């Protein structure tokens, strides 16, 4: 957080302003998504959205000259436009869709099954955000407060529930999931999610190599990866599908790393 002191005339206001995605709460995350879309639109609307993100009072905000507001926004909220969102906690754990409240995944995707991840992440890769959110946000069990177990037979019903959500909310939920995915899956499994530029993994300089096993492409999704993993273990498919997604991804990453180590020893 950055401490901001706004002084206009005899009035002063002290604010704690987030300076990275991880410091935004759910409401600010939604506003940040709106702020992004307004960059090519109305400056007035963009500045009002910025005011709501930093939580400055309207009275104080009106006292600041427009040019100074723009400079302030560029300095304080530049991370919204420049940085890729990455954080481990679910900023929007619940969302109201019509008359029902839907519950999302736990922090670090700790309650997301491999089957659920296959569906949700494949939808995300293809830009089908509403379908992805219908997988991730489901009615909660009234006794436990946890989401009801994922079932592909409930997809059409869940899509109807999510249909009540506006586009901005869907965008915020998608950004939220992708940020948690990046911090909890991508950044922890560098062999499965190889770099696009030269970098170091386990102390060795590597380059992205399309001939090596990688995370799925936009067209293929995770289904092909899953079937390749099963091989002769088809009889254990349900066990895999019900396992934690983070566990399976970590296992795939380890297999890729071990395969590379064997290749190095042979060379």
Feature annotation, model-predicted:
Residues 1-267:
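An amphipathic, hydrophobic-aromatic interaction surface with interspersed Lys/Arg
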